[in-house]
Swiss-Prot record:
It comes from Actinobacillus succinogenes (strain ATCC 55618 / DSM 22257 / CCUG 43843 / 130Z). PANTHER family: FRATAXIN, FRATAXIN, MITOCHONDRIAL. InterPro entries: CyaY (IPR047584), Frataxin/CyaY (IPR002908), Frataxin/CyaY_sf (IPR036524), Frataxin_CS (IPR020895). Involved in iron-sulfur (Fe-S) cluster assembly. May act as a regulator of Fe-S biogenesis. This is Iron-sulfur cluster assembly protein CyaY. GO terms for biological process: iron-sulfur cluster assembly.
Amino acid sequence: MNVAEFHQNIDQLWDSIEEQLEAQDADADCDRQGSVFTITFDDRSQIVVNKQEPLLELWLASRLGGLHFAWKNNDWVNGQGVRFWDALTEACQAHGEQVSFI
């Protein structure tokens, strides 16, 4: 994946997060600022998803800690084989929001 594809992929992922949260009536607000995507919950807690362009990685920070994901076999996966969508679902649940992502 080149840098342009990386940014396009992440932008599509961020769009999908917003759409899926909306579709599930989640009590969360999404905000994009440059390379950072923030999900803020009613209690003001946050999940932060950011682009790491030099590494072509996607990082996720939440109450559960921080995870790094690389693009492998058409999916964002961390070093332990956890899919980004599964980690995001778990992170949202840790913030009190019962949602699931594809």
